[in-house]
Amino acid sequence: MSNFSPREIVSELDRFIIGQKDAKRAVAIALRNRWRRQQLEGQMREEVMPKNILMIGPTGVGKTEISRRLAKLAGAPFVKVEATKFTEVGYVGRDVEQIIRDLVEIAITLVREKRREDVKAKAHLNAEERVLDALVGKTASPVTRDSFRKKLRNGEMDDKEIEIEVSDSGASPNFEIPGMPGANIGVLNISDMLGKAMGGRTKTRKTTVKDSYPILINDESDKLLDQDQIVQEALRVSEDEGIVFIDEIDKIAAREGGSGAGVSREGVQRDLLPLVEGTTVATKYGPVKTDHILFITSGAFHVSKPSDLLPELQGRLPIRVELSALTREDFRRILTETEASLIKQYIALMETEEVKLEFSDDAIDALADIAVDLNATVENIGARRLQTVMEKVLDEISFTAPDKAGATFIIDAAYVKEKIGGLAKNTDLSRFIL
């Protein structure tokens, strides 16, 4: 669990996301409150619940990105889902409890990676012994092994082909038990059941000495780890630090005077209620309590309003944050200031072909102007519009780059307008192309 202060969290998010101060502050406080709760003792720690967040704002302004970066920063298990993917229990489709099962799977992967790091040194030594076994055989004398070990460490044997035995963790058939709630809790993994009884399956792989190390280190790490301990730790991490991001929540809000699929929509909201409030979800690894999982929901709310959500669900999302639409200045800053801005990405991509790209200030202004105009006249898709515009502007250079090694292209406003100006003015055409 990271112990960044809210100010540090906001400045970290500023590296990747432009503007949206209110949303950044809300998620920073929510993350810091988790750390504060961890410092409490006993009963009070159980009583403190996370304050779930509802983000309201048009598409492409940074709702998803804020949550994704936040989870990375926290090193917490994070799962992003679309509310529209789920159906009411009893209907065909996924039920909302699957969200928590996915969260546990992600937590197990996270914990396993962390634990592998702890035993990496020991696993590396064991892997080296196995490479030596493959090179000189298990019965070789200590002198022979030592001489080969020196060659191995000097990199002299890197290209030599060897055969290694590794545990076979290939996909085994899954069987589902009919009538189980969620239809996934009853998944029986045959290799899980029979693996221990059969002593674990292995398979032979042919590879070079250099490439065998990562495979063998993973294999040896898993032998040194206690799988039950990993599962217990993952369940704890899911419960205490898990973050669930539910996008498109506005699409399951019953619209005023609407009809049709309203029942199923409302059903999904009702199924979400206990999850957000706090319930126990059965997973194949054990029960998971959702009381302290942080839920961040978001929606554009073009057609419906936040007040169209069920009152009970509104009450469980106490923190409301409105994200503003992007301005011309925001587009300029997105192109130039973010850590891996689109311009930096294209310059780096072209450098692989030994082609140099240079963008003038007026080109950046022109790109921002075109993106703002298109969002206003065609459809507002936020910052994603820049990708479409940039791709169109650099289409010719991208296509001919392999033949132009050593060349330098200066992109200025005139070049941008030449490539895209006419299309942007013709609204009917730009609807289809941009």
Swiss-Prot record:
What Pfam family is a match, any one?
AAA_2
Protein species of origin: Brucella melitensis biotype 1 (strain ATCC 23456 / CCUG 17765 / NCTC 10094 / 16M)
Q: Which SUPFAM superfamilies match?
A: P-loop containing nucleoside triphosphate hydrolases
In its UniProt record, a GO molecular function of this protein is: ATP hydrolysis activity
Subunit-level organization = A double ring-shaped homohexamer of HslV is capped on each side by a ring-shaped HslU homohexamer. The assembly of the HslU/HslV complex is dependent on binding of ATP.
Give the highest taxon in the source lineage: Bacteria
Give the keywords, sorted: ATP-binding, Chaperone, Cytoplasm, Nucleotide-binding
Q: Which residues bind ATP?
A: 18, 60-65, 247, 312, 384
Task: Summarize the protein's role.
Answer: ATPase subunit of a proteasome-like degradation complex; this subunit has chaperone activity. The binding of ATP and its subsequent hydrolysis by HslU are essential for unfolding of protein substrates subsequently hydrolyzed by HslV. HslU recognizes the N-terminal part of its protein substrates and unfolds these before they are guided to HslV for hydrolysis.
Cellular localisation:
Cytoplasm
The protein, known as: ATP-dependent protease ATPase subunit HslU
Provide the Gene Ontology terms for cellular component: HslUV protease complex
Any one Gene Ontology BP term: protein unfolding
Give the residues annotated as coiled coil: none
In the record, what lineage is assigned to the organism producing the protein? Bacteria, Pseudomonadati, Pseudomonadota, Alphaproteobacteria, Hyphomicrobiales
| Primary location group | cytoplasm
The record's similarity note reads: Belongs to the ClpX chaperone family. HslU subfamily.
